Amino acid sequence: AKDLEQAFECYCKAAKQGNARAQNNLGVCYMKGNGVTKDLVQAVEWYERAAEQGLAAAQYTLGYCYKTGEGVEKDPKKAAMWCEKAAEQGIAVAQNSIGYCYDTGFGVEKDTSKAVFWYRKAAEQGNVGAQYKLGKCYYDGNGTEMNYSEAVKWYRKAAEQGDANAQNMFGYCYEYGEGVAKDLAKAAEWYRKSAEQGNATAQYTLAIFYKNGYGVTQNKAEAAKWYKKAAEQGDANAQNSLGYCYDHGEGVEKNSAKAVEWYERAAEQGNKFAQYNLGLCYEYGDGATKDLGRAAEWYRKSAEQGYAVAQYKLGRCYQYGDGIEHDCQKAVEWYRKSVEQGCAMAQCDLGNCYRQGHGVEKNLEKAVEWYRKSAEQGYDRGQFCLAGCYENGEGVPIDKEKALQWYKKAADQGFESAELAINNMQSSGVGTAVAAGAAAATVGLLWKILRG
């Protein structure tokens, strides 16, 4: 402490005589409380005196103070001005900072080409932050032409210096073969380096690699571990995935209550997948008290973000009045949104609406059209419904052979009602007139299945 006080006294004498370095050092003393009571206002005053004499270090620090409001009122324009003065004298950290100013329009008019100019100056001096940002500019085509090879070059330099963001992006380039030969093992290696430094995005991606065995030996427990690390940092995708792990006992002991807890965290951040999953939990009372109203509410949030399966579920809520007012027209509206994205379940239920005239004018031909779309995607209920139409001549001519073919496709997937329908047909003989009782039984099965 005594040495710091003596140094402070020496700096004071030299600073008052106009020595720029002493003025800067005096600013440091006041900023850190070295040998004197901490005083940010005094620090800024001395930095300014040194900066006005052209001392680059003081110019950069003064710019920082104007940026953060330490010892002076925030002033983005002055922050950028002093930062640029320091950058022009070759201070790498200042070059990186003024690059950021031009990149974002902080205190200056946004100019991404100038941002690239300054990032390059700093990057060539080895500034790791600038190397990463320059790589990102090349990757995104921001301020320069898109060039994955150049992006990889700068990502590599920053990654090898230990920058977690660069390590994550370098891994990403290896994963997708952008600017470098695709190599999932190397991608996993760089994701791990980034993840171990706490990068949530890399932690989430590394979890996916372990879940699916991409570039590493498949390990569900490791996947859950990395999902949890990312989830605890607030990554919504990881929170949803961790919820799924608890929901299905993947890599962790099955725990429906914990699944709901993580789904809720992600859902409240707007994650549409978690919103849908949470809706399922409330619909079936899995990990939470059954509540069809809350289920419908979460399905709606997900559906409004365009998630096709949630749109289908919301349509069913409207069609059957589950937790929401019964409204077949709204059901059809949501089914239509879902089928536009190719959802086989919604295609089948839209077919049901046309078959029964629920929310739309009854049209058996359109019913068959939607059943067929669903069936051709391999959806067992769509296959069953299409088979029923062929068996009974609803919207298509009676064709027992085709009916049997579609029933068999559904039955092969374990659809019990299809197996019963096959037995009814076979007991009467395929290709001949089916006994009235057998036909009636099949129609009855079809009607029951329409309700799901």
Protein language model regions, located:
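Short helix-capping/linker turns of helical repeat alpha-solenoids
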Residues: 3, 11, 16-19, 32-34, ...
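TPR/TPR-like alpha-solenoid repeats
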Residues: 14, 29, 50, 65, ...
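TPR/TPR-like alpha-solenoid helical repeat scaffolds
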Residues: 385, 415-430
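Short hydrophobic alpha-helical membrane-entry/anchor segments
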Residues: 426-432, 443-452
